[in-house]
Amino acid sequence: MKKILVAVVVALFSINAMAQHEIGAIVGGMNGASYKYWFNDALALQADLAVGLTEAYWSQTTNGVTTSRSDGMWDFVLNPNALYHWDLPVSNLKIYAGGGLSIGLYDMLKKQPGQSTKVAGKFGINAAAGLAYDFDAVPLVLAFDFRPGYGLGFGKEQGSNDMFTTHMFDWKIAVALRYKL
């Protein structure tokens, strides 16, 4: 039993010895803070906390009536993604792909006449793909992201007890600059 416990402790410390952290900013379709934790040379967890403007294609059902349209929206989201990285033949350049969640708040920029929604909640999934360049001379990483996603919005109209749900497809393009700790 002691040997198993020692083996588990050694394994946990070796995982942390390989771990690398990156912290920085992301701008574009989402603007905010970006953090990345490396589990090994290829697998990482990236979490972004950001505010963004995007075009959403959505349909909304209120009181059994469904409407569909494309509209601009702002959102404030926590966006954690699991990403797998592959080395490219160019030195220090990696391509990555993965997916994750989008959890936060949103509101439409243009409202229909008489529509005055409060800020609504948002939960969804997204894919993520991009390129990352790791600078040799300084501990910086520059990354370009593309993130298409599907989300579900939910909330209430002001002055009403009627709940609404909104199904939306959105996408974001962003650039991140992170410092390697």
Question: What are these language model-derived features?
Answer:
Residues 37-144:
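Gram-negative (and chloroplast) outer-membrane scaffold detector with strong preference
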Residues 19-31, 44-53, 103, 149:
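Transmembrane beta-strand segments that form the barrel wall of outer-membrane beta-barrel proteins
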Residues 13-19:
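Sec/Tat signal peptide C-region and signal peptidase I cleavage site
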Residues 43, 54-58, 136-181:
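Predominantly the C-terminal beta-signal and adjacent terminal strand-loop region
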Residues 22, 30-34, 75-79, 122-126, ...:
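Transmembrane beta-barrel architecture of outer membranes
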Residues 24, 36-39, 150, 167:
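Short secondary-structure boundary/capping segments within folded domains
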Residues 4-13:
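Sec-dependent N-terminal signal peptides
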